[in-house]
Amino acid sequence: GKRFVAVSHLVPLGAASPFEVETYLLLGLPRSLGGEGFCGIELNVEVALSASARAIVGKSRVYIDLLLSSPDGRRQVAIECQGKASHGRAGDGLRDADRMTALQAMGYDVLLLTHRQISDEDRFRAIVKAICRMLDAEYRDKSSDEQRAETLLRSELFVDWTKLGVIDGKMPVRRKTARSWTAAVLSE
């Protein structure tokens, strides 16, 4: 609805998948909007590796899906979104393990996050508490209003993303001469 469109403007550029967007919104939105209120989340952060980390992964740089930092900047948590597509080819799991080990060798706390973990409220709450521990931040239970906001956010996030924007079987498209969205059949 209108709320989802408003919230979607809060997502920075750089998300590589709907899973990363969902995770970013759940962690980064203010609690009043249903998120956890973590500040300063960065998406797809390029990390130049040290010599020892390069020896582990065989690359000079890697990318972190989401990077959370403590308010004082002294602690960081690298979150790697482990979507279904990330392990589609033989050897992907081993490459991911090498990348995580290289980041850990450089001092990063690394969390591997699955869609199942973010979509299940109890699992997600446990992950949030773990992130707080890693960042040396205090976790505070949500108020009843914040819980309602989270329920609403989850109902809008966990949808079929391939159907977003479809109205009566038609996809809104932007016409070069138009100043507003108009519905058009996809084959146009």
Where are these regions (language model features)?
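Surface segments flanking catalytic/ligand-binding clefts of nucleic-acid enzymes
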Residues: 1-188
